[in-house]
């Protein structure tokens, strides 16, 4: 990047729409289920038929409150719904029911690890609203599927507290992880159950001003989010540099863009509307939502251990590195897998490496998730225990791991019974003979070892393991090698 760009910084905030996994829609009994035939999960309410009246889904409120507890937000005892008026084919009522003036949650924060540093990203508010339908295009024609219309959402609005793409991605991934842990949404980006809108402006470094922001709609991957933010930052800086004497508000008008991944650029969709354009007013068909402290406290008590807390526990209780702990807690199912394995294996550091690196890497290559791969936590624990007990070597363990991936459900003991040739060599006489031959063939390494160069010992061990195809027990190799060297 040019040195000119280095004098500027981005100011980033996110608006995240999260579909809640309730059984029915927000204001009607129509099913909330993705993938059904178009326009089969609809009602008079979500299609806006005259005379239909909304009834608030209690489960959606509980899930919103649970999120508020998880982010340590201020949960309003009194909140209210408003109508946001706009015309679009996917909104048959020509308005959305949302919370504009009095949201259910104010404030809160998302805890994240950014490049090894603990960070807190502040939230402005979280409110409940219903989703719109979906336009589906068929050549020159378009149809509308109202199955999604009326699906309950929470919209999570952050403060403009991020200053680079890495911040935004860390915030987004940490938010998804938190939502997964508390179980209020499946957060399936491909199905649209979580959608990210990114607001970004730029300013000279050190300046406190907030200039006009541009919204980039519907980021459906974290990689695209990072790319779009970087490209938009450069576009805005170029505009300001090319028009240095112009009012900044006129240089970058508030607008909505989309990301074009093929052209690697943001593309203008429309200029921004103001709040007045939406003609917000209180929803006349819904009463004020009233909560009690005891209701909130009852929901708070159902919170599970959250990712950030689990991260610190893994470091303190299991002695894991920050990097490994961060990988484990990023996925609730992986964390659960690891904790189940910990019941049968107490070498937590080695176990965490096998879960994240060895089996995690194999699963990534095959395009599967570890918890659904057919590998069981007990099997991984058994494998690590076998290494620690000298039953197998690390090299053989990797071969067994490959076989476990090929034969889902089989544990190391079963594989070793079927393939006894994988067991380490048990003929100590043969091993002593190989050690003597290696020592005889490497006189320079013997001299180095005698002169205190410890690397020479590692070299000799490596030669022995090579001669035995990795089947010699490393611990016993070291013992016998030292005995052989002491003879001289």
Curated annotation (Swiss-Prot):
<dbReference type="Pfam" id="PF02934">
    <property type="entry name" value="GatB_N"/>
</dbReference>
<dbReference type="Pfam" id="PF02637">
    <property type="entry name" value="GatB_Yqey"/>
</dbReference>
<comment type="similarity">
    <text>Belongs to the GatB/GatE family. GatB subfamily.</text>
</comment>
<keyword id="KW-0067">ATP-binding</keyword>
<dbReference type="InterPro" id="IPR004413">
    <property type="entry name" value="GatB"/>
</dbReference>
<dbReference type="GO" id="GO:0005524">
    <property type="term" value="F:ATP binding"/>
</dbReference>
<dbReference type="GO" id="GO:0050567">
    <property type="term" value="F:glutaminyl-tRNA synthase (glutamine-hydrolyzing) activity"/>
</dbReference>
<dbReference type="InterPro" id="IPR023168">
    <property type="entry name" value="GatB_Yqey_C_2"/>
</dbReference>
<comment type="function">
    <text>Allows the formation of correctly charged Asn-tRNA(Asn) or Gln-tRNA(Gln) through the transamidation of misacylated Asp-tRNA(Asn) or Glu-tRNA(Gln) in organisms which lack either or both of asparaginyl-tRNA or glutaminyl-tRNA synthetases. The reaction takes place in the presence of glutamine and ATP through an activated phospho-Asp-tRNA(Asn) or phospho-Glu-tRNA(Gln).</text>
</comment>
<protein>
    <recommendedName>
        <fullName>Aspartyl/glutamyl-tRNA(Asn/Gln) amidotransferase subunit B</fullName>
        <ecNumber>6.3.5.-</ecNumber>
    </recommendedName>
</protein>
<dbReference type="InterPro" id="IPR018027">
    <property type="entry name" value="Asn/Gln_amidotransferase"/>
</dbReference>
<dbReference type="InterPro" id="IPR017958">
    <property type="entry name" value="Gln-tRNA_amidoTrfase_suB_CS"/>
</dbReference>
<dbReference type="GO" id="GO:0070681">
    <property type="term" value="P:glutaminyl-tRNAGln biosynthesis via transamidation"/>
</dbReference>
<keyword id="KW-0436">Ligase</keyword>
<dbReference type="InterPro" id="IPR017959">
    <property type="entry name" value="Asn/Gln-tRNA_amidoTrfase_suB/E"/>
</dbReference>
<keyword id="KW-0547">Nucleotide-binding</keyword>
<dbReference type="InterPro" id="IPR003789">
    <property type="entry name" value="Asn/Gln_tRNA_amidoTrase-B-like"/>
</dbReference>
<dbReference type="InterPro" id="IPR006075">
    <property type="entry name" value="Asn/Gln-tRNA_Trfase_suB/E_cat"/>
</dbReference>
<keyword id="KW-0648">Protein biosynthesis</keyword>
<dbReference type="InterPro" id="IPR042114">
    <property type="entry name" value="GatB_C_1"/>
</dbReference>
<dbReference type="InterPro" id="IPR014746">
    <property type="entry name" value="Gln_synth/guanido_kin_cat_dom"/>
</dbReference>
<comment type="subunit">
    <text>Heterotrimer of A, B and C subunits.</text>
</comment>
<dbReference type="GO" id="GO:0050566">
    <property type="term" value="F:asparaginyl-tRNA synthase (glutamine-hydrolyzing) activity"/>
</dbReference>
<dbReference type="GO" id="GO:0006412">
    <property type="term" value="P:translation"/>
</dbReference>
